C-alpha cells in the first residue's frame, strides 16, 4: 500500500526513513515517550535505526509527526497488527515528545490517520491498548470517540472504534 504524506494546519505526517535517525533517536531517548511502551528509551543511535527498520518491515505503517513551525519531529503515529477482509482491523499507536504536549497536536494528527484507515485501508475497526496509568492517552482516545472496554486485557485498557462511529 502507498502511504501518503498527510498535512494539517500545523503538522506534516510522513513515513519515517533512515534519514530521520537522529530525530528518532532524540525522540525515543525521552523516558516520558517510552514510559508506557514496550521498549526502553534509546541509548544508542543503532536502536533508532532498529525502530525505523521495524516500521519499514512491519505489516503496518508509522508516520513521523513533524511540527511545521519548528520543522521538528514531535512524535509518531500509525497502524500495526493489521488484518484485511470484511472485518479488517488494525491497532493504532501514537507517541509525542513532552515539548509538544498539551497543544492538541496528536488529536490533529490522528483524525486524518483514522480517516485514512477507514477510507483507504478498508478498516472496519480500529483498536488501541493503553496502560491504565497513561491518563493523556486514555483522554485522547475517549475524546476521539473510541469506546472503552472496562475489562483490562493483559493489564491494558482496550479501546475500539467501528467505521460507522467515526465522526471525523
Label each PLM-derived region with a short phrase.
Residues 32-53:
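Conserved GNAT-fold acetyl-CoA-binding loop/helix
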Residues 1-36, 62, 66-168:
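Acyl-donor (CoA/ACP) binding surface of acyl/acetyltransferases
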Residues 47, 53-56, 125, 160:
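Juxtamembrane helix-loop transition sites at the ends of transmembrane segments
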Residues 52-66:
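A short helix-loop-beta-strand connector motif used in the catalytic cores of GNAT acetyltransferases and
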